[in-house]
From Swiss-Prot:
Protein name per UniProt: Protein RecA
NCBIfam families for the chain: tigrfam_recA (TIGR02012)
Organism this protein belongs to: Chlamydia felis (strain Fe/C-56)
Keywords assigned: ATP-binding, Cytoplasm, DNA damage, DNA recombination, DNA repair, DNA-binding, Nucleotide-binding, SOS response
Compartments in which it is found: Cytoplasm
CDD domains membership: RecA
GO molecular function, one term: damaged DNA binding
Top-level taxonomy: Bacteria, Pseudomonadati, Chlamydiota, Chlamydiia, Chlamydiales
GO CC field: cytosol
Recorded name of the encoding gene: recA
Function, as annotated: Can catalyze the hydrolysis of ATP in the presence of single-stranded DNA, the ATP-dependent uptake of single-stranded DNA by duplex DNA, and the ATP-dependent hybridization of homologous single-stranded DNAs. It interacts with LexA causing its activation and leading to its autocatalytic cleavage.
Amino acid sequence: MNVPDRKKALEAAIAYIEKQFGSGSIMSLGKHSATHEISTIKTGALSLDLALGIGGVPKGRIVEIFGPESSGKTTLATHIVANAQKMGGVAAYIDAEHALDPGYASLIGANINDLMISQPDCGEDALSIAELLARSGAVDVIVIDSVAALVPKSELEGDIGDVHVGLQARMMSQALRKLTATLARSQTCAIFINQIREKIGVSFGNPETTTGGRALKFYSSIRIDIRRIGAIKGNESFDLGNRIKVKVAKNKLAPPFRTAEFDILFNEGISSAGCILDLAVEHNIVEKKGSWFNYQDRKLGQGREAVREELKKNKKLFDELEKRILDVTSVPKATVVEEKKEEQSIQPVV
């Protein structure tokens, strides 16, 4: 078959496919605008936004946040919710653990009056609610907290001590097969919070694993491993917060395995001012001499905590340092990308 005949045959095949499955069911990759720019939501920590390589967590994808207890998983997810709301988006929180603190969420910056929350009885209900919300095309981010708390209905109806092999893994695999395409069409970001477990009998290598089987690892575009590495001491005997280290364990949109560090303070969540200061020092924008921090010909202050407080008060200086950091790192800011969300009819999920 020569070139003109091949072209005619391809055009005929495309015409038949579009007639059979609808317009837009097949197209040139270059004409698909979604491949050229990724709409993202900021995480609240600039160091993590830079480590992700795209300026935040992507819309239309699945993101998994996992780590040990009290490592900041829910705090990070709530910051993403707050930033989505600040961009004019709608957020939903599926609280399978029944442990979300409205006061702390409000302190972080989430608008709890506009935040939709669901506390389902079983895992099937939780995942069905997530799919229905995504299918509506009106929700920008859905947080599922957590995978370990998604109890299959048959396990819930059974007795304590009954053995249920692979029930949760099968439930997650079935749900994610349906959810992935829906999220991509509606440009909804689904954030799954997950816990750490240990494999029994592992002598060599890392014994840690996450709950819910392998499906979530496969379908996630980004997997974020978050750990507490130290305490932030105050002037008195009590701690101000925790120092957190994050590793991007998987990334389909940028180079993986990058790391980032930031502070989580008990009275404000992720310290954006602390992130800016650390990055400014790292990129030689702010000079650190002993305990003093200098910017250009100006002394910012003595001691990291004092300078961090100064950056919180001085919005102009904060924005200037952030702009210079972004210019040096050449990573795009997380911006609002207008998406034409196609209205989809909501049907019950079987």
